[in-house]
Design a protein with these regions (language model features):
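Short acidic-aromatic low-complexity motifs
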Residues: 21-25
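C-terminal catalytic core of tyrosine-transesterase DNA break-rejoin enzymes
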Residues: 128
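Vicinal oxygen chelate
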Residues: 1-18, 28-29, 35-125, 135-161
């Protein structure tokens, strides 16, 4: 009798991001430097491009590959001016991680700041067109506390037309 294979393999979460990039080998180096990623597997295509790569950042997996338009694959976000998707990472020390990401080549989209929802938070764009938000949770709050803090924060914001 055969054991049933798990639908979600050990170590995976239900949702796993899979990124398409231009120059996946350079992206692998960037994610290692910027986010401390561990490269678990790289499957090269016959032409040397990366068909599939598996990385681990903290307790989560990230998959990526080079563009393969000749196989009907999607273009990298850098081909279209960016992506509407943001990947979020919780870290023990967001200040150090943010500095590492910028040092590795990320551009700052929103500088780090203490947010009304209890996180120290900022956003960067990687050199491959993907956006990342980085945070350290600094304060647990009840829904009522968060609502009060949100009202205070929004009261300070400029009004849109």
């Amino acid at each position: 009798m055969t054991d049933k294979v798990k639908a979600v393999p050990d170590g995976f979460h239900t949702v796993t991001p899979h990124l398409t990039v231009r120059d996946a080998r350079r992206a692998l180096e960037f994610y290692q430097k910027a986010f401390g990623a561990e490269v678990l597997h790289v499957a090269p295509a016959p032409d040397g491009k990366v068909m599939h790569a598996m990385l681990k950042i903290g307790d989560s997996f990230l998959m990526l590959n080079d563009e393969f338009p000749e196989m009907g694959g999607d273009p990298a976000p850098s081909a279209n001016g960016g992506s509407g998707v943001t990947l979020h990472i919780y870290l023990e020390n967001v200040d150090a991680a943010f500095a590492r990401a910028v040092s590795a080549g990320a551009s700052v989209k929103m500088p780090l700041m203490d947010m009304f929802w209890g996180d120290r938070y900022g956003t960067v764009a990687d050199p491959f067109g993907h956006k990342w938000s980085l945070a350290t949770h600094t304060r647990d709050m009840s829904p009522e506390e968060m609502e009060r803090e949100q009202e205070k924060a929004f009261a300070k914001m400029p009004k849109s037309a």
